[in-house]
Amino acid sequence: MVAAPLLRAHQAARLQSVSTSRLGLNPHVIKSAGRLQLLRGSSFSTATSKWQAGVLDRTRNIGIIAHIDAGKTTTTERMLYYSGFTRRIGDVDEGSTVTDFLPAERARGITIQSAAITFHWPPQTAGDGNTTPQEPQTPRSASSHTVNLIDTPGHADFTFEVMRSLRILDGAVCILDGVAGVEAQTEQVWHQASTYRIPRIVYVNKLDRDGAAFGRTVREVASRLGGWPAVCQIPWFEGGNGRFTGIADAINLQGLRWEEGDGKSVKMFNLEQLASEEPQLAQELKRARVALVELLSEHDEAMVEKFFDCEEDHLAVPPNDILESLRRCLLEEQGRKIIPIFAGASFRNIGVQPLLDAVTNLLPSPPETPEPEVSIGGVKGGLRRLLSGDLLVEQGEKAASAKGKHKKKSAIQAESRNAIEKLQGCALAFKVVNDPKRGVLVYVRVYSGSLDRNSILYNTNLNVSERAPRLLKMYANDAVEVDSIPEGHIGVVAGLKHTRTGDTLVTYSGNKATPPEPLNTLQLRPITVPPPVFFASVEPHSLSEEKRLQESLAMLLREDPSLHVTVDEDSGQTLLSGMGELHLEIARDRLLNDLKAKASMGRIEIGYRECPLGASGPITKIFDKEIAGRKGKAGCTATVEPFDPEETTTEPDPSTLSIQTTDGNQIIIQAPGLEVEVNKKGIEESPLLPPGLDVHALRTALQNGCLAALARGPQFTFPMHGTRVTLTFNPAEHLFGNESTPSALSAAARLATSSALRDLPSGAGTSLMEPVMNVIISVDEASLGAVVHDISSSRGGHIISLDEETPLQTTGITSNPTDDLLPPIDPNKVYAPPDPFQSSTVGIDLPSSANRPRTITAKVPLKEMVGYLKHLRSLSAGRGTFVMSVDRFEKMSAPRQKAVLAELRGDFF
């Protein structure tokens, strides 16, 4: 059944006009963009129109995730070519790809940013404008679907880019290297996708290469990714062990053989023809179909009924019923997932069209995905609960009880309905890019309603309103202007001045500058930024270039929130921090070459931390100075002691206002004698505080002052870590009427905390801490001994385990609570076709024990991992790879601290 749309797609791709546009777009793509005008001006309604429902059902927001060099960009280029989007196949080695459009990407042959592309599969034809339902036994891939594709990086330094993209995906294609199998970075991204509950299919690539082992890779999917592999295709090797020429489809019981060329010429064989052409492959295909039906029957009751309807004949089950069963199992949220597996060789143009059919047949449309989490007025829940009004009713009841009022439920429901009617659209900004021609582009995913051109967008994170002058549909680095971005789609807003990555944008009806309460507090789940571990100094060439440099750095931070900028108080140097060496190198390229900042960057350094070795006594400081021409006076008492995040917390003191843990430090604020009351608006107040200063402002000012002091240690000037600061604010001693402004309180807290850090007892003081990394190294058996010796002796690392297959969630690099509760899958119970060349040939048993893959899990100081890749490659004959993430900061031993300090000062031994 997949064969018909596959052939139709090939024919349509040949015949379609590529119009006069330099983009080479199908004219119907442009028409579909214009068709979005129908959505303009209509206020949001929970009952989506029939036309919109049809459009949404035929929309797929998917991502491509994989280890570096697994073939993500190569596969994407083939997808664009076969969909009719491009007229030639882009090549990574030539630097002619559509998705890798940054100069740094084309120079290095790697993906750095997540490129967003929209195309149609199968390519649109004149009759594809309607949204009539499909016949029951017709697969979804028979009609054209809109595919919004995100090509993500595979390099460990760009993990934040991957997380940023995963947040807005509905489904994903995970590409595996058929030679290397499941690699460390693949596991990391796979389990990140599990936390967002993203349905995934697996595509085993590079099966044309020597040493490719499809069967072994299938078993690794079971043991390392923690799911049941559903083998939907098996590779077709000429004569059983010759050249890779095609695939055998277990769903449709047919063979597909690709001719030489661009991959558009495909010859199809039914089971009888396959049996006469390749009898061994036909027998294996039958075994694959039996295994697939058996696996689905274990997880889907409807498949069991269909199996009995077909008189218990595995081969008689209709292909579309298998597709629907696979889809149900894939979209099921509970229990162990089934992982559909497909085969191909993208560089040889084999297997990409059936993969696109699988995307439209198996991956979910926006309404079928788990609802995103939102918070509104301090109440959390799902987006659909918000749009139905239930979440607003809960929030209204909570707000009424906080004010001491008792509203009727009917009145709260009426207010909720009124608020929801005013909500026209809700979107998440997941990426900000500074385009040299178009200015700042903000990539958004619309979760409800629509974003219209010239509408007012309210940013609930920054509490600012901005107009959306232009809306675009992006085709990598090219764009088509549209009038509206509808629900479930990904688009770009040009011309926004304030929006950052992770901000929530809402549109609403009415003339007010801000949405009505509580819509102004609506936030989609934000994207958490991992801590940076490398930094480099940035210096402008002259004083006149400093302003330009600051503007460029601000733009860089809007684009990539995983970068941080700080200023060293002593030297006045600007420091740029990032996730890794390559990350900072790319940031430097963007800063100097793309943003044209006239500056120089110093060498990349490691971000160490300081920690207290003992407790200080209470230190009281009174701040008494003019701030911006206004007298400010306030006081505060601070004590400092070591803090272990893993220790059990004790009951807080009754006078405690807040306990906050940030960057490995704990701040406790106590206010004895402060009589806290909640007013009618739900705001905490105290009669002892001067007008204009509520409890929230007091708490925030003290926290900010303390954080400013902790950003700089007393001995080595590195940020503090593992520090507990107790701030005591006594209104009788530390409050001076209207002079105690938030600025004065913040300054008093900073002075008291800094003094307490300097007052640590002699002999205690502070010690240096260094980042320790969780490292997973993949090598073959022959290199294992040399690599283990290098890690444990030369680099001062600690080996955790040596395993042939280590599931990543057990190593601490990432965690997925659902996987931890399920028992591991026995690879021997998994169906996998035999690999060619398994038997001994010329006296060599492949795979031999010497090249059997092994995994080393270790904890190693980051300093020893700088530039480690070239050492690993020399130890493993170029075959070793590794991935690492920050585990924790650990206190250094005295000799190690002395050596590091000597190196930082430039001393020589």
Swiss-Prot record:
It holds the Pfam family EFG_III. Its main location: mitochondrion. It comes from the Eukaryota. Residues 121-148 are annotated as: Disordered. One of its GO terms (cellular component) is mitochondrion. Residues 57-367 form the tr-type G domain. Keywords: GTP-binding, Mitochondrion, Nucleotide-binding, Protein biosynthesis, Transit peptide. GTP binds at residues 66-73, 151-155, 205-208. Transmembrane segments: none annotated. Coiled coil: none annotated. It is found in: Mitochondrion. Residues 127-148 have a biased composition (Polar residues). Residues 1-15 form a transit peptide. GO terms for molecular function: GTP binding; GTPase activity. InterPro entries: EF-G-like_DII (IPR053905), EFG2 (IPR030851), EFG_II (IPR041095), EFG_III (IPR009022), EFG_III/V (IPR035647), EFG_V (IPR035649), EFG_V-like (IPR000640), G_TR_CS (IPR031157). Mitochondrial GTPase that mediates the disassembly of ribosomes from messenger RNA at the termination of mitochondrial protein biosynthesis. Not involved in the GTP-dependent ribosomal translocation step during translation elongation. HAMAP family: mEF_G_2 (MF_03059). This is Ribosome-releasing factor 2, mitochondrial. It comes from Aspergillus flavus (strain ATCC 200026 / FGSC A1120 / IAM 13836 / NRRL 3357 / JCM 12722 / SRRC 167).
